[in-house]
Amino acid sequence: MEQALKQARLAFDKNEVPVGVVIVYRLNQKIIVSSHNNIEEKNNALCHAEIIAINEACNLISSKNLNDYDIYVTLEPCAMCASAISHSRLKRLFYGASDSKQGAVESNLRYFNSSACFHRPEIYSGILSEHSRFLMKEFFQKMRSTID
């Protein structure tokens, strides 16, 4: 999760919502890809950290199925990202801070408990959540101060 937090800090420094992700091969715990939100730079609402990382991982291993991989995310995934995690069949999801507005794992939609979900990863929440929450709070304070 520390590496995902480093990615979130990179996003913060680029004025992107500070969400970071790493995907790890379960058998040796090696990070195969890391990413962060890139929505503003790419001018593309689909460029969430999870989507970028899943796309890169699938390309790297030449497979749409990531059964032997885990994903670490600094913020609870939204509905789009939760669906991508399910469709790519990631084994385990570890995330930091909950997202009371857009979170779709445990906060709101609970995508993985819905009938629309065909693969449910093992879910572990609250991993270094205080660091993720602090970074999000700092980011939105910074954004509000530039608007004023």
Curated annotation (Swiss-Prot):
Cofactor: Zn(2+)
A Gene Ontology molecular function term of the record: tRNA-specific adenosine-34 deaminase activity
Active site: E50
Domain of life (superkingdom): Bacteria
Catalytically driven reaction(s): adenosine(34) in tRNA + H2O + H(+) = inosine(34) in tRNA + NH4(+)
UniProt EC number: 3.5.4.33
Alphabetized Pfam families for the sequence: MafB19-deam (PF14437)
Assembly with partners or alone: Homodimer.
Function: Catalyzes the deamination of adenosine to inosine at the wobble position 34 of tRNA(Arg2).
Protein's UniProt name: tRNA-specific adenosine deaminase
Organism: Rickettsia typhi (strain ATCC VR-144 / Wilmington)
Encoding gene (name): tadA
